[in-house]
Amino acid sequence: TAFNYDLRLNFDTSFTGKDLLRTRLRTGNFSSQPFGSSSSLFKLDKAESYANAVQLDRLYYSFPGLAKGVTLTAGALVRNTEMAWIPTAYKSDILDFFSVAGAPGVYNKATGAGFGAQWAQPGKKGFVANLNYVAQSGSDSTKGEFNAAGALNTLAQIGYRAPQYGIAFGYRNGTEGTRVRTFNGVAGNGGTLAANQTSNGYALNAYWQPKKSGIIPSVSAAYGWNYVSGPATPNAATNSQTWMAGVQWSDVFAKGNASGFAIGQPGNAPTLSKDALMWEAFYRYKVSDNISVTPAVFYVSNNQAFSGASSNYGGVIQTRFTF
């Protein structure tokens, strides 16, 4: 049993009422295993390994583009998934794999120096399109913003969303130093691409949710395919696929509460005799507008993070305060 915290302080400034300059400070005390490392299948969405040190976590500026519905973003510390649309109605905020809608090869939470453009068709429903670029080693003068060794991530997305449903196709290209999150049994340095390697990730996500809360839950599903190429690529770790399906009920027992269940397959190295399978279940109790308590349990089969393949259970009680 461990007691951990994650603290974020956002300093938001607007000059016109339509733009946003965000500076975020963050600290926490999660250890890398099992909850704090993006290489772990038990990685929690809200956990990072900061060892109690306060760090600058975000620094970016967003502003409207010239065309209607366009938002432009640039910054020294910006995340690719925050310049895109995560197409899912399943939002447990527990395991990292499900927080990126079962597509960690595309929505890999790459953070660094970058820029992006987002477009949403005006109205309650319509098309969306996003394109962004993040260099995770952009602050390193020996690599830079546009050097292939600088962990470059290019993410493109097109989709359609309406009040009750949505669907999107996403693509990400990664270079040396990038990685697919929550990968099981991958060859190489924890899944990080080596010199002369590139990755191409593809994802199709869709969801549907009822007009009103009741016994019928929202349904979310995803399929992802990832391909790694390059002269240094081990033959045993070129292709992988991921999928997930999740259901979530709203206003369970009381308004504002939620519960859900999700199951999925993380990326697995092709050499594994059995692929990993993971699931989670949660119930979120809304104490007030600013406080929630979420007990959750989860399970991973054939987890390669430990000595030999093993099946592991886990659980958390996540309390969140916002102000």
Regions found by a protein language model. Name each.
Residues 275-313:
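Internal helix-turn-beta structural module
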Residues 124-126, 149, 160-278:
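Detector for outer-membrane/organellar transmembrane beta-barrel domains
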Residues 2-4, 49-56, 106-110, 147-151, ...:
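Transmembrane beta-barrel outer-membrane domains
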Residues 32-34, 83-86, 140-142, 178-180, ...:
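Outer-membrane beta-barrel proteins
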